[in-house]
Amino acid sequence: MYKNLVAAPACALAAACFLSALAALPALAQTPTTPFTDSEPLKAAFVYVAPITEAGWVRQHESGRQAVQASLGQRVKTTYVEDVPEGADAERVIRDLAQQGHHIIFTPSFGYMEPTLKVARDFPNVKFESITGYKTAANVAVANARYFEGRYLAGIAAGRMTRSQVAGYVAGFPIPEVLQGLNAFTLGLRSVNPQASVKVVWLNAWFDPPRERDAAMTLMNQGADVLAFHTGSTAVMAAAQERGQLAVAYHSDMRRVAPDAQILAVTHQWGEYDTRRVKAVLEGRWQSGSVWGGVREGMVRVGDFGPRVPKAVQAEVLARQQDLAAGRLQPFAAGAQPVRDNQGRTVIPAHSQLSDAQILQIDWLVEGVQGRLR
């Protein structure tokens, strides 16, 4: 998760570096290590940027840790440290875990990337997994998810459910990852409801429940009857529940907070990836490299439909999810007509689709989004 705002030039550099790592994956791969043969369990650690709650970014990664422990049993001992701020505190915690003899350390926050790399240089025999990072090293791999794929599917559901033809979107910062999701949501929405539009509120914060709630209330007061968000709490879901409106959950299933309001949940799944990486250390097969996985890889999915969503809408969304998995559907693709931004400029020419490089550097709002980036 991007904890801090990244300036546009830095975003472009990040995209370039991430794509270079993807393209150079075979070259980055290191000679497989010796299989783990210690009599004691392999030690795997996870560092979290916020406290563990019942839903959200950290919850999904904690579920990944639990999946590792459940899958590998006594062969592995997992631990975690929660609520670790990015920066100096992160480096201290990561270094301490390495000194304690952990064999693999997962650091799932963008602001952990540099501290991870710094510690990794001093502990060449420890493997590091920098989740949402983009810089690799001999003992540092990176991974992220194509969250925008789930956003597109959520947009389809929202387009079917809205009655006011207005959706609201509470967003953190206008960085590429957020813009990917906002634009994909809008494209999905308008693919089934061309008259619908999206109003967005920028918070310039990732986790601020009171302001997230206020933004949701503002959007509903402006006519939005379906909401989505790219922030860190359940506040938007709670606001929709309070007002009797609908909302798309992000990160986790949030029906405990919004049992009547939830349309569906866009979730990212880390259990399979984390387990595969820990198992690779156990078997001496761990290699550095980059992964950017989506629905096809099982890293992103939608589901957990709420009670107000008709079965026909559920079936439609799940069918489109299968199309994504099979490669038959691309969120950032144009048909006979080009896709334009909300200033009228062509951003996807007719009969074409964006490359990964272009998706990673999105700096525009698609037609149908009301507002500007700042």
Predicted regions mapped to residue ranges:
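A residue-level marker of the well-folded mature domains of exported/periplasmic proteins
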Residues: 30-374
